[in-house]
């Protein structure tokens, strides 16, 4: 295992242990994070997002990760998050593909990809099934996620 594979492993092990501080230590101060739920987050927003998600999960979040691969500049991993979605209390099993870029021994860019329609069907039931594939619905979810993060950052 090289140092960047060890860094990815450290990140997801901390995530599985609900350790937001250690997760944050894996990121470069100028980190960019992108995913379908939040869109683009930068710098301290990224660590605050993970902290918020861990607090909202109230210990009911299961993280599994696999296929950790990295070289000197890029890396990837697959991970699965199992939790109850806070707005509906519906069980979600989200399968995510992550890509990383490294700088100065830390993660400078983190991109998570997942099937938004599949996620929305689990999180919202029939509404997600009918509307989850639409750009309108996806933008609404993203807007609500960003609003929750902004409120959390004020605390």
Segments from the language model and where they lie:
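A beta-strand edge to alpha-helix "cap/lid" segment located at domain peripheries
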Residues: 54-64, 69-155
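Hydrophobic pocket/interface hotspot
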Residues: 8-11, 23-24, 31, 46, ...
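Soluble or luminal CAZymes and related metallo-dependent hydrolases
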Residues: 3, 45, 92
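Short, low-complexity N-terminal intrinsically disordered segments enriched in polar/charged residues
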Residues: 1-17, 21, 25, 29, ...
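A solvent-exposed, acidic/Ser-Thr-rich amphipathic alpha-helical stretch
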Residues: 21-22, 29-75
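Aromatic side chains
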Residues: 11-15, 27, 33, 38, ...
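Alpha-helical structural motif
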Residues: 7, 45-46, 116, 137
């Amino acid at each position: 295992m090289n140092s960047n594979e060890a860094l990815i492993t450290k990140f997801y092990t901390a995530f599985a242990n609900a350790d937001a501080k250690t997760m944050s230590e894996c990121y470069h101060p100028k980190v960019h994070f992108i995913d379908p739920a939040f869109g683009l987050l930068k710098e301290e927003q990224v660590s605050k997002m993970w902290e918020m998600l861990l607090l909202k999960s109230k210990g009911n979040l299961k993280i599994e990760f696999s296929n950790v691969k990295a070289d000197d500049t890029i890396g990837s991993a697959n991970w699965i998050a199992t939790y109850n979605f806070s707005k509906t209390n519906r069980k979600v099993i989200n399968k995510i593909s992550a890509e990383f870029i490294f700088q100065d021994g830390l993660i400078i860019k983190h991109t998570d990809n997942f099937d938004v329609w599949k996620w929305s069907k689990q999180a919202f039931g029939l509404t997600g099934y009918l509307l989850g594939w639409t750009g309108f619905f996806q933008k609404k979810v993203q807007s609500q996620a960003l609003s929750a993060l902004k409120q959390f950052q004020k605390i």
